[in-house]
A protein has these predicted regions:
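Extreme N-terminal leader/targeting segments of oxidoreductases
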Residues: 1-19, 107, 122
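Conserved N-terminal/central alpha/beta ligand/cofactor-binding core
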Residues: 8, 40-41, 46-133, 137-139, ...
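Core beta-strand elements of the Rossmann-like FAD/NAD(P) dinucleotide-binding domain
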Residues: 15-17, 150-159
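N-terminal Rossmann-like FAD-binding beta1-loop-alpha1 element of flavoenzymes
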Residues: 19-43
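Short hydrophobic core segments
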Residues: 22, 155-165
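Hydrophobic/aromatic ligand-binding patch that stacks against planar heteroaromatic rings
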Residues: 30, 34-35, 47, 55, ...
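Conserved beta-strand-loop-beta-strand element in the redox core of flavoprotein oxidoreductases
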Residues: 131-154
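Glycine-rich loop(s) and the adjacent beta-strand/alpha-helix scaffold that form part
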Residues: 162-181
Length: 181
């Protein structure tokens, strides 16, 4: 922000990471965990107070329509093994549909995030802007600006992953975004 605005707004110190993942849902959490396991210092930014994304926010209590491979598949299997909801009246487990309670999903994801010492979770912190370096037709996102506890904070990293589900980071960065078909 311009210098005159900086005087009226309180800023937290700038933080630097190797990877910033915006969106702590079904796409962002596996991305953050795998980056941390590879040795990267990761900021996982979530606008909501709880992690989980749409399965928690909108009570979407089934995972479908996404590839179930790698870490996502392992998390899904653990979730369903420990917390899956089935139709026990019929005595059979369903094929295709996999239901769970959002609270169980939050517990599973939170536990897996806490296991990774290289992840800094910043929940309740909406992204309010992006920092973009102009490189002609190859602009590069170098960081995000978040609103945290009544203060603004800038996070920088060589890699920023937009896992918001809505493409808000891409849109804020000037990318052409299309929704639907």
């Amino acid at each position: 922000p311009p210098a005159e605005r900086r005087k009226s707004v309180s800023f937290y110190p700038v933080l630097n990471f190797d990877v910033i993942v915006v969106g702590a849902g079904p796409g962002g959490i596996p991305a953050a965990i795998r980056a941390a396991q590879a040795g990267a210092k990761v900021a996982l930014v979530e606008e909501d107070l709880a992690v989980g994304g749409a399965p928690v926010d909108m009570y979407v209590t089934t995972l479908f329509g996404q590839p179930s491979v790698g870490l996502s598949k392992a998390l899904e299997q653990e979730l369903l093994r420990d917390h899956g909801l089935y139709n026990y009246e019929s005595g059979t487990k369903p094929k295709g549909w996999r239901f769970f309670l959002p609270s169980a999903y939050v517990r599973l994801l939170s536990r897996n995030i806490r296991k990774e010492k290289n992840i800094t979770l910043l929940s309740g912190t909406p992204v309010i802007g992006t920092m973009v370096v102009d490189k002609g037709n190859r602009n590069r996102v170098t960081g995000v600006r978040i609103y945290r506890n009544g203060h603004i904070q800038e996070l920088y990293a060589p890699v920023t992953i937009d896992a918001t589900g809505t493409g808000v980071v891409a849109a804020m960065s000037g990318c052409v975004c299309m929704y639907g078909s």
